[in-house]
C-alpha cells in the first residue's frame, strides 16, 4: 500500500492466475487500453491515446494535504468514476499505468506511469498495515 501515490497492492496467493506484467512507460502518441467499471456499471476495456507525460502533485481530498510528486500520463480518454485503480495496458497487454482521475470537463484522463507504479511497489508493496477507507462524501 502506498498512500502517497494512492495505490493499494493486493496479493492472493491461491489465485490460479498469473499477475499482469508491469512494463516500461508508454510514450506520447501511444495507443493504450484502460479497464474498469465506469459509473459502477459492467466491466469495460476502452481505448485511449497518451497525450503526454509529466510530473504533478495531487491534493488529498480527505486532508487537503499535498501528496508526493508523481509522474503521470495525460490521456485522451473517456475516463469515468469507477475507472480509478484500473490498469492501463499497451498493445501487448503489459501494464503501463494505473488510472487515478479525470479532468472536470472534456475527455481527458490521468494515470500514473509504469515507473511510478514500480517505485511504489518496491517501496510499499509488502506493507500489510491497516489503512482507513476514508469517509463517505456527497458528490
What are these regions (language model features)?
Residues 1-44, 128-131:
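Conserved active-site neighborhood of the chymotrypsin/trypsin-like protease fold
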